[in-house]
Every structure is written in structure tokens, then in C-alpha cells.
Amino acid sequence: VDDPKIAEYRKAHEEITGSVPDYWASANTYAALQILEQAIVGAGTLDKETVTQDIKDNTFDTVKGDLSFKNNFSNTFWSVGQWQDGVFRGVKGSNVDGAAPVRLKDGWK
């Protein structure tokens, strides 16, 4: 993975758990927990409505970069990935930089 934050996360995950994290959901799950932690701290309470409002109103520093939500949706994400030379790379996304060109495989048109 070319992104330094995700590479650091993957290394720490493997050191702590002894298992290699998957290339799709693991960092997403960790980012969601980072958002929740920051929202609780920002809200200063565990009250569901207050924490929810903090998530709606703020941008959060996560392993996947700065994330925010509009109408309950984050518009920053990778939607398609492809294995290339043993590395899982993002090839299509929304508001993300660094997409690798899609490599057509033999027989693809």
C-alpha cells in the first residue's frame, strides 16, 4: 500500500494481532473507530445525540485521511481495487488521490 498512514496501520495491526489485516475492510473499520473516538472526545459525552451531531459537524483525522460526512455520507472513498505486482491498489475512487491505472488482464476487452 502506497499510503504511509495505511502502511503504518497495517504494520501495527500485524504486530499487535499476529495477523495480516485484509486490504479492504480493516482500515475502514479502524477509521470508523477513530471517528467515534474523536467524536466522543469532541462532544465531551457519551450521549448518542450529541456524539452524532459532532460527527455531522466535523472532519476527522483517520488512517484513511481526513473524513467528514454530508447527509450521512462520506464522499471520500476507494470504490475499486486491483492486485498489481502483489500489492492491492486503489484504481477507482471518489475524492482520493493516487489511483493506479487499471491493468487489463489477458482476455479482458
Please place each PLM-identified region on the residue numbering.
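Extracytosolic ligand-binding ectodomains
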Residues: 1-109
